[in-house]
A protein has these predicted regions:
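Conserved histidines in hydrophobic membrane contexts and catalytic metal-binding motifs
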Residues: 28
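Catalytic core of pol beta-like nucleotidyltransferases
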Residues: 1-25, 33-39, 52-100
Length: 100
């Protein structure tokens, strides 16, 4: 199993926990999605959050830590689709691989 499959499987295995935290959809992008990761690469994760749930900054930090732990404790960069800059959004969405 390659790194991308491992990451996708881990996120899918924790779908119910992430859903309970207000996550509707999760995707992987960046070098992991392109299968170009190296030992120094982080794992880039894109989230769609349930806007009906009020997620404050503390909840978001806890969610990022939860995802980091799910993915083995390494370097993980978590962004929301809503928080993406317009200049990055098209590229990120194009290369994203959906977990759920």
């Amino acid at each position: 199993m390659n790194e991308l499959e491992t990451v996708i499987d881990a996120l899918r295995a924790h779908k119910s926990i992430l859903n309970a935290s207000g996550v509707l959809h999760v995707a992987v992008f960046g070098s992991t999605a392109r299968k170009e990761q190296s030992a120094d690469s982080d794992i880039d994760v894109l989230l769609d959050l349930d806007e009906t749930q009020k997620i404050n900054v503390f909840d978001y930090v806890a969610l990022k830590e939860q995802i980091r732990e799910i993915l083995g404790g390494g370097c993980v960069d978590v962004v929301t689709r809503q928080g993406l800059k317009k200049t990055l959004k098209d590229r990120v969405e194009k290369e994203s691989i959906n977990a759920f």
